[in-house]
């Protein structure tokens, strides 16, 4: 442990622009990407029932605010793209019942982050709150939607160093966006991410 505040500060300072960038994504960020895919799959299951509702949001967005430094944002976008490509390859090649398959990893993420809340969703809502779309969903119901949930996910580094912009279409019928946006200041002030 640390005995002095100055020792603590030396070991926990904020990243600087020229620090070495991690060469791999931390497990927590990989898990967050898997959670985003599972959330998108759940929303796809509920889409048919919700599409007529004024609460329906067709877009699916994930925000990663890893650093205010553009170099770090761009490098993170590259690592997330690589990881997403690995997930896609695994989904295409693995069998759901195989040990070590991506589907086992999805199920583990489901059990640790989703299962209890989704199966008991009504207990988390305020008394008297009624939302017909908040129905329990099981992993076995989500499993067939994982492939379609992954299809078309874009990874964008949204900053001043590149031309990538996050723009949601206004015209109908809307082609829903699935996007993982990595950024800093461009995404932090006055920008609304839809389906976050």
PLM feature spans:
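N-terminal switch/interaction subdomains of large nucleotide-dependent motors and GTPases
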Residues: 1-25
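Short, surface-exposed loop/strand segments
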Residues: 1, 6, 29-34, 38-55, ...
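A short beta-strand element within the Helicase C-terminal
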Residues: 178-182, 187-196
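Short acidic (Asp/Glu) and glycine-rich catalytic loops that position anionic groups and cofactors
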Residues: 10-14, 58-60, 194-196
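Conserved C-terminal RecA-like helicase domain
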Residues: 24, 28, 42-179
